[in-house]
Amino acid sequence: MNQLLMQRLTRITDEERRLLDGQNSVDKGIYTDAKDFVVDSRKMLAKGKLIDIRPNTRFVHFPNHRHNYVEVIYMCSGQTTHIINSSVKIVLKEGDLLFFNQHTYHEILPASQRDVGINFIVLPEFFDVSFQMIEKDSVIGQFLVSTLCQEENEGRYLYFE
């Protein structure tokens, strides 16, 4: 990966600075106003945007949560450990991708400064056009059909090594 880009991605965010300065847990108010920990796209995306990126929060256990959008995590360097639906443990390594639909609960174990993951925050509407180009019989196509049609409330994920 481009060295300049990696320098930018490994920078300590304001949230991470507070964690390093002694705050010992995630400030849920950054992510949601709801009692249940559902990360809200309205807090993560600028109005009118369908997709955005942000770095994974490091240095702290990110508690069990889900999103009201599709999340795609790309691991740029190092590794992060994800516990999915309280039972499946996945260690995401450099170059790996992990997709979550809106019903998947997961938590993330603490990461170091060199463990750089990028979260793609994607509203389901983003896939309206791209979905037409994806073969519906493929693994990604089936995942998108179940995610976009919301006919089920089952937490699903895709993991690519």
Task: For each feature predicted by the language model, list its residue ranges.
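Gram-positive cell-envelope targeting signals
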Residues: M1-N2, V72
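N-terminal regulatory/effector-sensing and dimerization cores
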Residues: K49-Q142
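Short amphipathic alpha-helical segments, especially helix-boundary/capping motifs
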Residues: A34-K35, A46-K47, I53-N56, H82, ...
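A hydrophobic/aromatic-rich effector-binding and dimerization subdomain
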Residues: N2-L20, N24, S41-R42, A111-E161
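Residue-identity detector for threonine
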Residues: T10-T13, I30-T32, S41, T57, ...
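N-terminal, Lys/Arg-enriched amphipathic/low-complexity engagement segments
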Residues: Q23-I53
